[in-house]
UniProtKB/Swiss-Prot annotation:
This is Uridylate kinase. InterPro entries: AceGlu_kinase-like_sf, Asp/Glu/Uridylate_kinase, Uridylate_kinase, Uridylate_kinase_arch/spir. The gene is pyrH. GO terms for cellular component: cytoplasm. Homohexamer. It comes from the Archaea.
Amino acid sequence: MLVLKLTGRIFDEEDLVAKYAAIIRRIGGKVAVVTGGGEVARRYIAMARKGGASNTFQDLLGIYASRLNALLLISLIGDDAYPKAPSTVEEFLDAWRRHRVVVAGGFQPGQSTATVAALVAEAAGASVLLNAANIDAVYDDDPRRNPNARKIPTLTYDELERILKTSVVPGGYELVDPWSISILRRNCVTTYIFDGRRPEYVEEILRGGNPGSKITC
């Protein structure tokens, strides 16, 4: 069983989406995937914000963008995948019982896709979550703002929480959030953070490697 979180930025590059679909088809066992919204979400949210839309409506635009990305991935995976993007945990579980692969986007306003991935891992009873992120690992500071930030190969959720509280500008370091940390920690799910531009790292991790950061309880 594998739970895979894909940053929406992967969907900004056509070849990356196809490569992830091929890997999901190739690996054995059940696979749950949660997709972010990517450039489509950012662009629509920016336009809505400029026009005065509420935060809730902006969240909805992001959710539908993430589900559009989920449907694209579903179409590339083919018959192994549930043909819809579940919109609730209950719908995910129903699909999970009947299909080898289930791909979801966002669930509800105010909830990140990182939290959705944690909820999916919990619901599926997964022990491992792979997070194909927009950076290559966890650092002790945001590496895009601090060129001297230090990469951390292994850490605990408590340590990650301290880093996020002390070193990160909200919304600027898109890995996990407090809700997702709480869910993953209470279920003792091991999370691997790796560079989403390197889909081959999925299989490297499954072989026991750690190309980015490994987070444990």
